[in-house]
Amino acid sequence: MRGCTEVITLLNAQVDPDTGYDVYTPTKITGVSWYSMAAATVTTSGLLAADQYTVRIPVDADFSGKGYVNPIAYKTADPAKSFTIQRGDVIVRGTIDTPSRITAADLSRLIGSDGSYIAFTPPDPTATTVDAITPASVQQTCSDVFTVLSITDNRKAPHAQHWKVIGK
């Protein structure tokens, strides 16, 4: 595909069986197309604005050595060897320096006060508090982060096989 020069980090959610909380596993994907636009809707109660993102991920992109599995198989898959694309996952434009798995609370620590991405420092392993930080709150902090709303699987096309991911 043409214009596939961007790098993204896909954060897949997987439920930790010990805690019951979502744990996010990052996958760096190189060679994708990133498009964003400001979208607005006028309603009787005022103007509603939300950025819309479209990312096209070619099947021949660099997935950092991981293989794609469908969302159902990902629930029990080894996240170090596989990734999926599903509603609710988070996509960040660029590379995030993280450990292999991060929690929703850790995700909030990846954003600097100026909105830029920073190197990740693992939290104190002896801490027992659980922060209520969610991917949605990260999206409010940085303009180049979105939550996946829909996925179109275009891998059966004769040319330019890819996944089309749309989010806000």
What are these regions (language model features)?
Residues 22-168:
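Short, conserved turn/kink motifs that form compact alpha/beta structural patches or helix kinks used as
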